[in-house]
Structure formats: C-alpha cells, structure tokens
C-alpha cells in the first residue's frame, strides 16, 4: 500500500517494524528500489528487527559514493575513465570557466536531495547549449531549495546505442561474485526518466569489468551496484557517469542472462551458503 510518508525516517521504521513483527517467524529481505529507500535502509540497519536482512554497505560509505565528486576520485585511483568534469559548489561565483565546449551536461551531485525540491521544469539531467542557459538553470535549481554541488560535464556524442550498463553483486566479504555488462539500445526520453534504460542486450568486456572489480573490492563493497557508462568514439574509451548503490531500474537484463538477482541474496543471507 502506497504512503507518501514512507521515505521519512520515523514512518519508514514504524512500517518496517510492524511488518517484521507480523511475520516474526520469517526471514525478511529488505530491498530498496530507489536511492532514497536504499539510503534509509542503510542508515537504520542497526535499528532493524533481527529477522530482517538488509544487504547494504554502511551509510557513511554509501553517502560518500552517492556524491559524484567522491566517485570520480575513486575512478582516478583505479584507472576508470569518466567525462571531463567541473564541480560547481553552491555560492560559487558565476564567472567560472569550463574546459570543454557546449553543449554540456548538468546534473545534481546528490540526486536524493535534488528530488526533494521539485519545480516545474525539473529534469533528471540537463543538456545545456549556452552559457546563458547554464547560468539560468543553475539559478533555478538553487532557487528551488537544493543546496549541494552541481556537476557540469563534457557531453559525450552519440545516441542511446553508445550507452552501457554494468550490474554486480558482492558478497559479505566484499568479493565480487557476479558481473553483467549490458549494451543499451534504447533509453527513456521523459524529463524525469531520461537515462533510464528501456532495451538492453548483454555484451561482456573483460578489461572494463576487471577495473570495476578492483575498485569495488578495494572499497570492500557489499551488495548490488549499478554503473552507467557511455562509449566515447572520440578517444575509444568507456566513460563512467555514476554509481548506484543498488540494482538498476532495468536490471531484469541480468536475470534474463542467467544471473537471478534474488538468488544471490537468498542463498547467502537466508540459506547461509558461500557464493561461488
């Protein structure tokens, strides 16, 4: 049953506690399907009932990874490419310069905070075609109440078919046990859904996956993750946009490829099996 208060701390805990008590003879796997829900689960892991399984990293690590600037520093450490990036900080002078041409991409560093402050022309990602438009949209975002950083990036040319998506699962010990790379053929093109994948086929790339494995295991990452990637034909490199600390909206491509995403959690946390 839908409730608009479910993404608030108190109501979330009240709802989860009630469900756990109602099913106290069962093991309950708690899965978040959006960034705000995943953050709530991670933040309150220690307060959850004993029969609830919450397969997520600690909140401090999750919160830092949600910040795109932190993620790009990790990319540099592990040789993972990402687009040319300028981080605009709230209150910064508007006379800054960027080292790449228009059009550019503009998006919030903290998407959870961003969606908490809706406005009529709000988009998930903006394609900005001039400096005048950039200044105008930045002002509009901050006037709506968002107060964190904004990410301005080089726009990588190419349509939906240049996109890739990488999903993985890491066990309790921080070891990657499953990786599945998908080649995106079509995305959604609505203001709030831009960038969500609609059609995907699997297409492995061992070198790319190896770099990501090293990054995740260095972090001792636990649970599902999802990367958005785009192939840059200008230099032949795959550029990483961000990490989602959860399974993706379109993750059925993983199950369809033979990796049942539910099975990994159930076998490890419910049946206590060691994943191969």
What is each stretch, according to the model?
Residues 236-246:
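A short beta-strand motif that forms the metal-chelation/ATP-contact edge
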Residues 153-154, 222-234:
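A short glycine-rich, hydrophobically flanked beta-strand micro-motif that places a catalytic Asp/Glu
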Residues 23-66, 81-84:
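A short, GP-enriched loop/loop-strand-helix hinge that lies immediately N-terminal to
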Residues 1-19:
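Glycine-rich, highly charged phosphate/nucleotide-binding loops
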Residues 19-27, 99-100:
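Glycine-rich phosphate-binding loop signature in dinucleotide/nucleotide-binding domains
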Residues 62-151, 172-173:
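Active-site nucleotide/adenylate-binding loops and adjacent lid/helix of ATP-dependent enzymes
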Residues 273-276:
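Cysteine/selenocysteine-centered motifs that mediate thiol-based redox chemistry or coordinate metal-sulfur cofactors
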Residues 123-125, 129-132, 136, 154-220, ...:
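ATP-dependent carboxylate/phosphate-activation module, predominantly the ATP-grasp catalytic core
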């Amino acid at each position: 049953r839908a409730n608009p208060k479910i993404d608030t701390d108190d109501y979330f805990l009240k709802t989860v506690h009630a469900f756990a008590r109602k099913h106290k003879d069962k093991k309950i796997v708690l899965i978040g399907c959006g960034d705000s829900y995943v953050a709530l689960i991670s933040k309150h892991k220690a307060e959850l009932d004993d029969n609830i399984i919450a397969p997520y990293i600690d909140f401090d690590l999750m919160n830092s990874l949600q910040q795109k600037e932190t993620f790009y520093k990790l990319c540099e450490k592990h040789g993972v490419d990402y687009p040319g990036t300028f981080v605009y900080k709230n209150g910064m002078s508007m006379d800054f310069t960027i080292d790449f041409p228009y059009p550019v991409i503009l998006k919030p560093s903290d998407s959870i905070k961003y969606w908490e402050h809706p406005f009529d022309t709000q988009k998930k990602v903006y394609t900005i075609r001039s400096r005048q438009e950039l200044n105008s949209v930045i002002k509009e975002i901050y006037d709506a109440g968002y107060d964190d950083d904004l990410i301005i990036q080089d726009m990588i040319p190419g349509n939906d078919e240049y996109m890739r998506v990488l999903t993985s699962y890491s066990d309790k010990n921080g070891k990657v046990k499953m990786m599945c790379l998908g080649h995106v053929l079509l995305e959604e093109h609505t203001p709030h859904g831009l960038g969500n994948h609609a059609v995907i086929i699997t297409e492995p790339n061992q070198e790319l996956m190896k770099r990501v494995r090293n990054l995740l295991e260095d972090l001792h990452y636990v649970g599902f993750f999802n990367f958005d990637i785009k192939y840059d034909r200008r230099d032949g490199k795959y550029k990483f946009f961000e990490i989602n600390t959860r399974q993706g909206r379109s993750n059925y491509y993983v199950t369809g490829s033979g990796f049942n995403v539910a099975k990994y959690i159930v076998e490890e946390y419910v049946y206590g099996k060691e994943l191969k």
